[in-house]
Amino acid sequence: MPEPIVSRDSAIAADEADPLAYARARFVLPDGIAYLDGNSLGALPVAVPAALDETATREWGRDLIASWNANGWWTLPARIGDRIGALVGAAPGQVMCGDSTSVQLFQAIVALARLNPGRGVIITDGGNFPTDQYIAESAARLLGMQLVRVSPPDLPRVLDANTALVAFSAVDYRTGELWDSRAITAAVHGSGALMMWDLAHAAGALPFELDGIGADAAVGCSYKYLNGGPGAPAWIYVAGRHQATVDLPLTGWQGHAAPFALEPGYAPAPGIERARIGTPPVLSMRALDAALDVFDGVALADVREKSLALTDMVMRYADAALPGVLAVTPRDPQRRGSQVALQMPNAYEVTQALIARGVVGDFRTPDLLRLGFAPLYLTYTQVWDAMETLHQVLGSGEWQNPAFAARAAVT
């Protein structure tokens, strides 16, 4: 890592030397907003509105149903899947784009359990994002298996010959802790179990090597660091070595070997095509396809280096200038994703006061202010100034305004 950033002057110097500075122009960024919530919803890429207009006006409006062939709608899920695959270390033909993360979690968990019959336990992280736990719980109930919840560091305590699969997230959604995916995957395989990773908080924010670590399956969303927009389709990775035998539970017509033969019985398509389910949301996929252009020419190593520098700067600032605030994100850069979680009393009210000042982060119950860092469109100076704003909000007590205590439906 470069020298720590400990002043506004050093933040300015870091911006002047930033190899990713050019990428900021690839986004629509509102004036006066420090957007530190890219770990929840990424900013709008400049190319997306034109892509949506083209798809709606010319393709849908003029070419109508011919667009499935003439404009490549049919091949979008696999083509976008390969583009995402390139960002998560997956060779072509192993990632399919479509549906929601919850759906893809169900697909992956049930499929891996079926690939490893005779074992009765599914393991997930008790601190995992709720949908990961809910889907794992439902899958276990459906399959007549036991669900065991355990934090990744405690995995060796429960991993045994009865474990069918382990389903963890690469980055903890609350604290931003990055788990050692290579070591965990190796331990899981050593017990004869299979490994699934949720990369929702990793894809696009840091280099990941699904093939390299030997993952069996993975899922992820595309509206965070991939900037695909609200409700953008998710994706699933199935390692090539499993594709001939994997039995995915949701056997929709588009995953059939011959979808337009309209046969009454299901015969899976070869390769990753069998991971298709139903008709893809073309408008959302076109938006995502255009959004992925922001990564053209970008080295994920540069993204990672800037992310670590930004998160380090924020934690150093919190330690030095924010009494009563605890950064619960790991200091070790090898254990940190692309966010910082600040634990404090009245975190919800503080978050709302920051938003009113143009600093957008988010709140996670019970007491965390999360700040997410998307290196492609944030500057060091912008983040430094955001921390100064947090210092002012806490020092002035303005967060005590009763208006900031009103809970909205989405926090």
How would you label these PLM feature ranges?
Residues 1-411:
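Pyridoxal 5′-phosphate
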